[in-house]
A protein has these predicted regions:
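NAD(P)+-binding Rossmann beta1-loop-alpha1 motif at the extreme N-terminus of oxidoreductases
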Residues: 1-64, 68-70, 92-96, 133-136
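Rossmann-fold dinucleotide-binding core
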Residues: 82-85, 100, 106-218, 226-250, ...
Length: 482
């Protein structure tokens, strides 16, 4: 097979097939390979006329069909299948060639793979791709890591297929080795928080205010005309308006209330813990999904018949209208906190791993193609560009003002929910994070005293430098300098 393709895709399931078609739609000559040739044939039979494809029956044929320096994008199952395919390609490729892992890989795996492959003279790029199957076909948000040299080759290819926001392609070089997959991981963590906050808003209106799904869908439609304008708010309205054709009931009332997850939210929280970065909103969103899936535990709790309010707020029409606005304000404030925490995790990791990540550019490429695309990402990008958000997004004047405007509503929502038995872990944890930041003194002083008591971990004093330890077991409990 002669070398004619400028890019290739390995793995032609939903995401890989859609990405290959997107590449072909934009003038790329695309080599395609799947372990089972039947899937390759299916792609060619159904979509072969959409562009220039070069189907390969073997991996050797696939590599031979690529113009040097070769670029192969793999979209296979995470874990061992990914490692196996990377190794197989590396054995057939030459120094200067590029292997791109566009799946949802855990960033330490990407760092490990990049180190191994680069030692052989090849380039390895971990690239986060957001937008699902539709995004892969019509234009995703792309977050490639890897070397600057590999980016020179990939830039025109990726810019041709990425989503566009205000005319700009939603792709940028994130940083070295695992930076791309790290940023995609945090993107997904923010997505978890965003979805949980929306779900809590729905629950407050459904159970608290007794509104129908269609009525709540109307509210979300109106909210999408405000600063909350986003993909997730938009699709929430559509889901809530959907009527089940079999029963005539709202579809949301027939969906089992167990929220699944694939692991990226968990990775975000685990990594934040290892970096000592509080991502409370994201963590509570992950835990809320876990609780939703504890079917036996929840069923037993129902049998226990615990005392407590039933969630009904019993508000009159004017109070109801005002509380819906409170929920909107609380949702926006909590959303700001989620993004602030996510960007803080990126900043901390960049220092830890030596990545030079342009946070303004990250915000810009999230404006289109990805699941968390939202109007206010323009504000976030501007805040980082100006330097106003260098310490925290919350300190940028626009977001500081938004938080202050929403504060009373935010507190009212969390307080009413607690008093009436409605769980709002994401709202409440976001508010607590905000209050923790604004507190001049935290009870951590007591915790450090306890740690010194049982473990001689020492403490610092507010009135003099140094580390100290109290001799707790001795009668006089003298303090010594450690």
């Amino acid at each position: 097979m002669s070398a004619e393709a400028n890019v290739g895709v390995v793995g032609l399931a939903a995401m890989g097939g859609s990405l290959a078609r997107n590449l072909a739609h934009h003038g790329n000559k695309v080599a395609v390979f799947n372990r089972s040739y039947g899937r390759t044939e299916k792609l060619m039979n159904e979509h072969g006329s959409e562009g220039e494809f070069f189907p390969a029956k073997t991996l050797e044929e696939f590599v031979d069909s690529l113009v040097k320096p070769r670029t192969a994008i793999i979209m296979v199952k995470a874990g061992e299948p990914t490692d196996a395919m990377i190794n197989a390609l590396a054995d057939l490729m030459e120094p200067g060639d590029i292997i791109v892992d566009a799946g949802n890989a855990y960033f330490p795996d990407t760092i490990r793979r990049e180190k191994k492959i680069s030692a052989r003279g090849l380039h390895f790029v971990g690239c986060g791709v957001s937008g699902g199957e539709e995004g892969a076909l019509l234009g995703p948000s792309m977050m490639p890591g890897g070397s600057e040299e590999s980016w020179k080759t990939l830039k025109p290819i990726f810019e041709s297929i990425a989503a566009k926001a205000e005319g700009e392609p939603c792709v940028t070089h994130i940083g070295l080795n695992g930076a791309g997959h790290f940023v995609k991981m945090v993107h997904n963590g923010i997505e978890y928080s965003d979805m949980q906050l929306i779900a809590e808003s729905y629950d407050l209106m459904r159970r608290g205010l007794g509104m129908t799904p269609a009525e709540i869908g109307d509210v979300f439609e109106e909210w999408n005309k405000t600063e909350l304008d986003s993909y997730l708010i938009e699709i929430t309205a559509e889901v809530l308006h959907q009527v089940d054709k079999k029963t005539g009931k709202p579809l949301v009332d027939l969906i089992v209330d167990h929220a699944g997850m694939k692991g990226t939210g968990t990775w975000t929280v685990q990594t934040a813990l290892s970096l000592a970065v509080p991502v409370t909103g994201i963590a509570e969103a992950v835990f809320a999904r876990g609780l939703s899936s504890e079917a036996d535990l929840r069923e037993e709790a129902q049998k226990q018949g615990f005392a407590g309010p039933n969630g009904e707020l019993n508000l009159n029409s004017e109070e109801k209208k005002a509380f819906i606005e409170d929920i909107r304000q609380a949702l926006y404030a909590s959303k700001i906190v989620a993004y602030a925490q996510g960007f803080n995790e990126i900043t901390t990791a960049a220092k830890e791993y030596g990545w030079d990540i342009d946070l303004a550019a990250v915000a810009r490429i999230w404006r289109g193609g990805c699941i968390i695309r939202a109007k206010f990402l323009n504000r976030i990008s501007e805040a980082f560009e100006s330097g106003e958000a260098n310490v925290s997004l919350l300190f940028a004047p626009y977001f500081k003002n938004a938080i202050e405007t929403a504060e009373k509503s935010w507190r009212n929502v969390v307080a009413r929910a607690a008093l009436n038995g409605l769980p709002t872990p994401a709202f409440a944890s976001s508010l607590s994070y905000f209050d923790g930041l604004r507190s001049k003194r935290l009870p951590a002083a007591l915790i450090q005293g306890q740690r010194d008591y049982f473990g001689a971990h020492t403490y610092q004093r507010v009135d003099q430098p140094g580390a100290f330890h109290t001799l707790w077991a001795e009668p006089g409990r003298e303090e010594i300098e450690a």
